[in-house]
């Protein structure tokens, strides 16, 4: 469709319009006689072989030039007619940040005998804070109680009740028992494994919105990689036995974990982040630092922003 554009023309260059803007004579007074016709200047952008100039009154010739509008259709490129792409309204985007495990069922033990739950809680709280600071005010931190299995069912139910647009579960990694070695820490023998390290991102292909889950997982993994963090490659290796998982993207470290309850049973896109290995002695120290928590939480926020923008553009306001 052609768009209409109004082009400016100087009044002095449009003598044929002058009669339209002159006032009519007052009653009882004769109209002023027009002076001898003067040739009007021809605009440089108009080429005329024999310009014809109508007479111009002395009064109108004294007026200062003003912008007038000349109508005429002008074709514009399609890009000029395309509406601006909508962007996400973070205040309407609901995210559940799930703290993996519970105080009663603490998950893996770190190389220094700290429950995984404590690491999960600290990182999840930092993620919640940064998301809210960036406008995602509907973010909810999900803390559950009790034993592991019952806790998983509660997480799924809570996310559904909150009508979340995205479910993100926060965990820290360990290794199968067969890889553990012993060392002494604070006068006691502890288990450790420095063999593996890095983050990993999991989705379930049985999630009702698997493709969208995978889309967010890819964004999150790319942000982790952009910060220079390596991903845990061991989950695709036969040595992991029953802990082995299909690698969906070897560039970013996205795996499928099809039967995990919080990924399979949730009714919204769901992703699990293993932020790093706490059974690796060096990596545990990094995971315990505020600097690493800031890096990971910044990556999560960046991924959520991109994800929200894309969903908003496709589905419209939530």
Each model region followed by its residue ranges:
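Catalytic-site microenvironment of enzymes
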Residues: 1-318
